[in-house]
Amino acid sequence: MDIRIIIDGMKLNVRVGIMLIKDNKVLLHKNDNRDNYCLPGGGVHFLESSEEAIIREIKEETGLDIKVDECVSTIENLFEHDGIKFHEIYFIYKGTFVDDIDTNKIIENIEGKPIKYGFVDIDKIDDYYILPVVTKDIIKNKTSHIINREIK
């Protein structure tokens, strides 16, 4: 069960994402029902470390195995979505795929979700709408701990 707590109509989430980089390209995912891109990842379960969570999430969503190198950033992400205020703690890791992967192919979500994964050239990362918006700076190695306050 993911760490999601609702208090007074607001949500606390603990999430994890990973930068999987190969040939100066980073893997992003896009939900067919949304305009934005994100790093692949998901929710952290109760009594699960964030590192264990990212390994599990990538395996569940793509069937692929990854090796986690290090935690590169933590974002305190404060935002509103569909009228709900969120306080999200978001751990971002850097890692690699265990097996070789073709960066020119689209990876399908094996859980049946309307999500596709594809590699994006890091030099063209500014051409993409990525959430949280500070993710681009993390990909470009410019930040480590961020408070992303989109609401008051």
Regions found by a protein language model. Give the residues of each.
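Acidic, metal-coordinating catalytic segment for phosphate/diphosphate chemistry
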Residues: 1-17
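Short, solvent-exposed loop/turn segments at secondary-structure junctions
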Residues: 5, 36-37, 75-79
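Residues that recognize and position ribonucleotide moieties
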Residues: 12, 19, 37, 64, ...
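Residues embedded in well-ordered beta-strands
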Residues: 17-19, 25-26, 90-92
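Conserved Nudix-box catalytic region and its N-terminal flanking loop in Nudix hydrolases
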Residues: 22-60
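Nudix hydrolase/Nudix homology domain
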Residues: 32-37, 108-152
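Unchanged
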Residues: 44-67, 77-130
